[in-house]
Amino acid sequence: MDSDLMDFFDFSKQFSRAPAPKGYITGDPTAFATETIDSKPIKRELIGKDYVHEVVEKEKHLMKKLADGYNTSKNRRTLDELDSDDDEVLMKELPSVRSDEEYYKKYRFDLNRNKNLPIYEQREDILAAIRENPVVILKGETGCGKTTQVPQYILDEAFKRREFCNIVVTQPRRIAAISIANRVCHERKWQPGTVCSYQVGLHRQSNLEDTRLLYCTTGVLLNNLVRVKTLTQYTHIILDEVHERDQDMDFLLLVVRRLLALNSRHVKVILMSATIDTREFSKYFAMSSSLPPVVTASHGRKFPLVKFYRDQLKNIHWKDEPQRTTPGIGPEGYSDAIKLLLVIDNMERKADNQSQQSYEEAKRTGAVLIFLPGIHEIDTMAEHIGRIVDENPNFKISIVRCHSLMSPDSQEEVFLPPPLGHRKVILTTNISESSITVPDVSYVIDFCLTKVLHTDTASNFSSLRLEWASKVNCRQRAGRVGRLRSGRVYRMVTKDFYMNHMNEFGIPEMLRSPLQNSVLKAKELEMGNPSEILALAMSPPNLSDIQNTVLLLKEVGALYTTVDGVYEELDGDLSFWGKIMSKFPLDVRLSRLIILGYVFNCLDEAIVIAAGMTVRSLYVTGSRGQMNEAFWMHYIFADGSGSDMIGIWRVYRIYLNMCQDRMLKESAQQWARRFNVNLRSLKEMHLMVQDLRQRCASLNIQPLPYGACHMWDDREKSIILKVIIAGAFYPNYFMRSNKANADYDRSLFQTICGNDPCRTVYFTNFEPRYMGELYTRRIKELFLEAKIPPENIDVTFQHGSEKVFVTFKPDDEDIDTTKVVQVPGRVMTEVYKAVRMRLENQNRPLRVMDQNSAFKYVEQNRIGVISDCTWVPPSNQWPVELLTLPSVFDKTIFGLITHVANCGKFYFQPQALAERIASMSEIFNRSLELSCYVQNAKAVTKGLQLLAKRGNLYQRAVVLKVETQINGYPRFRVRFIDYGDVAVVPIDKLRLMSPQLKRDFERLPPRMFECRLALVQPSSVASSYNQWPQHANEMLISVAKSGRVELEIYSLVNNVAAVLIHTRGGVLNDMLVDRQLARRADEDYMSRKDHDLRLRKQETKRNVSITDQRLINEEYLRFAQLPKDTDLEPPPLNKCNLSIRLKGPYSPLEASLNSLLRIGMYKSVYIDKESVNSVLLDSDPQDRHDQMVVAASVTEAFDNLTVRGTTLMPNIHGFGALMAMLFCPTMQIKCNKDRTKYVSILAGLGYNPDTMQPHFEEHDMVINLDVAILKDDIRIINQMRYNIDSMFYNFDVNEMPSVGTEDRVVIFNQLRSLLIRLLGKDRSFIERHVSNFEYLWEDMSDLEPPSEPYGKRAIFPMHSSYDFESENMGNLLSLQANCKELYSWRNFEGTMQPMKCRLCNDTLESVAELRLHLLTQLHRDREKQVGWKQN
């Protein structure tokens, strides 16, 4: 590699670490102060097909010149040469016939063909037409034999003449190409891979030299022809199933038509289909003097088929509604289908005596196939049928669903006979039109509807639209009946509507789907710009769609923004990334994922994810109304990553390990059923992975050799995969709903009355008069459907509230060290499960007693007390005077850390209790107490309090669970009550408590309290799953072992103290941040509120007597205690005479998404229900920064967006902004008005410097920063962008990356180092800025342009930015004065007028709000930035 280029950024320079600010993203539309013309995207003008006429006329003129000079001219192979000023066009002469005598001696040729096939009758006509015409159209019904026989007829004819013959036959599907080739080989007794062979993707049989008949997929032939730009390597090209009109087929037709006239006139082209539009294809392939002939091959049906339309069924009493013109199933549609089922049943029942077939036999062979447009309609139809069957027991129906997301086992049910005496009714989507044939279907009910995917090329958002099916679709559906007996088809539209209003054919894919791959093929063809090529398609797309596609390809780096250095809206030079993308059978963003995987040395992971994203239904889905087990399988495989794509990678890894272990077929199927994995899809994915690996190897895109450089460890890989996902799917960026509102965390805790939101959900609609504490166990049982055991749940109530609070108990450490379902952040898994329960069913019935009966019940059973007509349930609260909790007046306390689980959970014994604890220990270890041996292991149950040996002494303990026995010796897991640690203790180390000991100590609260580190949280860079890094825990353990520890109490919430630990080396909390093991974090609302109270109490401590301090502290602790679960035995159900419906459960952490794209700003965003993020919660509620979600695809319906293939990005402050800066085509980073800080980023494709209008405004993205981004960050990002470009900075003639392994290692090591530096910074917070002109590109011509090593050939050009100005001293003094004023109001006890914190741009409505605002990390950072220090 050029040393000057490698030295461009002087990478050898040593960088000193410094705290740097970070960026924050918001997609909140309210970020705009007011709505202006600039705040909404301009509607792009639709440019239609006017461009086509000029191009087609030019093409006709060219074709005429070619035809006129056909016999005398020589061939030129490019459009520019052919369309020259020369009067005479050069063409290649027709070659002489080539003999192949030796080849035909080598293989056996049996000329006896199957004469029973309908196609045989047309054999001579077909061969004659092929001999006499360059293009022949063959229309033959499904099953006539055209696919297998026509190529053999041609080959046999060549054999007779001893002429060379090379035939290629395309198939739209891989499996079809393989199976048909094998069938032909079997029929002709040829060794597979000799005379007849196949090729799908790069997978082909090894020896193709002797192949004369090749079956391949459409894409294989297309790629080959685009590469060689001639048809002459074949004598016959047979395009089968041309009616399907996918993009590959339409582009192949274009290429074949062009090359046939250009340089391959002797090649014969045969177009075949069962439902071909002969008129359209004849016109498209018409020569100047003639049209291609059409040969028709058909065969009669074995059993008759009768079709009925809605208006022809006069005897059925359905409502005489007018025919719907808008596609859809009306309120009566489902009922009408059921009426038809009843008519069919009655008809066969009446024919029982007149027919040779009995009624029971008719039901068995008379299955009904109902075509519905989607899964939702299938479920609705099933519910309607189910209700009718329940009401009419004699109407016996066996419902079978059939759609593409079903498991293979479920699909097999379609072919099984129904239960005895039942009629099978198959509810299906259009998958059964051609993919599945069920022999026993005798009736079809067709709603004549279908769902078609359309893509808006401007936004790149897809929408699944409900449309009327084409007549071709309906005929294919009708062809599903009458295999075993006569059949009937009922079309749920009128005959007039069917004949005169429904389209004959569907919309070609080129007119409704993304055009990226077609435009790339057009660029590779090198016969004109994309619009000139695509104008020649059979169905040319709108020019707007081509223009938008070119913009999208520029956005992903497949095209450069210029053509020969000049910007073109409709064209761009093909980049080296584009050349790679054109070689993959993938969406360009998935190809970009593979390229970035190569750059960041995680190529294999990227290949697996890309393959998994192309395969449908990797997971098996359940039907509506059921608790979807498959959903939790997504979580298991995602393993806490919050990423559907990483989940795919983990599924494949497990599958690959099973394959390598040679797991038996039965075992693999059991595994697939257990984890709801579609094994068939997984096998298809495996083939795709192998194919992509081969394609990468052919391009010299391979992983770095193991050991050549520093490889990513598991923790780093979890982040780097999200980095490349963010890069691949830019700009599909979404932000969780904005938390910048200062009232957010207060309302969060108010909603659940101070409970922990990370562990609590709530129901509504429970009136207090029902005395809820009586039904806590019944409420716990509601969660059994989510497999949450009742013993792990606390249910509490708030006086006067209709809410029921359900709090999940945290796992006792070490009980379950490998949780099955991991979730990101602090929120417990059970909260996700509870919210998912509500999504399945919002109402939960609960049986209760009326108030009078409830009063009688509690009086009779002496449960609680009744005072002033109010029931007071029994309480099990600890006496507050006995609690070992720090006083509200104590700022620091000394003592011992008795046990460390992690930095977020450890236990502390105050030094003041040392003598009392020693006295207790002495009592416990008296010989009298130690003589209470456990005689019967069954007496030791969960929750039992006893004595257990800890070290050399026995201490109080509570049993957590019974462990497995070893050699028949019982063991028990216990927690030591006064120390906090957990241990597994054998039965001989346990002692029961004597009655006296129970009386004295059973109600004594623990002699320690739980702590966590305050103002910090685990670094997302240093750890996964929001868990504390091991090294951080080791630092805390080291402090604990050193002896007496000084704790500074920040707050006390729910009996857990947030603390700062003072050591000789400084505050441990800060030390963890300095070592990048933790990052600074806000405390939540309850913690800040308690901290403020403690500060004010401690300021008045000297004025309060010791006695009053104790009384005030007890009142403080009493007030701080939350209600506890009473866990009462519920009343018998026969006494519960009322049924209420609880609504929920809800979580206050439920979040929504906002799109960051300008085109999606004012749209509602929903996450696909099968995504791991479909239950989207604020996983770090104390963190005022929000996380970004990246989506693989986006679909649109009206003003709603649905995102699929989602990935929750790491909770690294500024991550979204940094990723946008790193992977966007270009960006402008904007400053505040004083140019003292960066406040927002405008990213996109850039703008026209002459008009200042954006090139692709729909995809412009604004990111408002709330942490500081420094000039050094932009420098690092530019270095990374340069390195990414350097990985492919040149291609040789073979299109191989020219960077060698040694240079790749250097580049990767640089990238790795820079990325770690970029993400590892502890960034200071800044105030948010908003503007009405965020989407305006600014003229930055006054800036010196950055150096561009690769000039116009850079995929990632360098970013430029303004230097900071010095802060104005007057402004600093003003901000300091504002800060001083805020603090002057802090201890005010009355009401105040709203005040403005100018440091943070926040309005403070009350003194309480002001106090808590002063404690936020944002305000503390801003105080440092303006130089304010409190006296």
UniProtKB/Swiss-Prot annotation:
GO BP term (any one): secondary piRNA processing
Presence of the UniProt keyword Ligase in the record: no
Residue ranges of every copy of the Helicase C-terminal domain listed in the record: 354-526
Tudor domain: residues covered: 937-1000
Binding positions (ATP): 140-147
Pfam families xrefs: DEAD, HA2_C, Helicase_C, TUDOR
Reaction it catalyzes: ATP + H2O = ADP + phosphate + H(+)
GO molecular function: ATP binding; ATP hydrolysis activity; RNA binding; RNA helicase activity
SMART domains named in the record: DEXDc (SM00487), HA2 (SM00847), HELICc (SM00490), TUDOR (SM00333)
CDD domains, sorted: SF2_C_RHA
Protein name: Probable ATP-dependent RNA helicase spindle-E
Organism: Drosophila mojavensis
Lineage, uppermost ranks: Eukaryota, Metazoa, Ecdysozoa, Arthropoda, Hexapoda
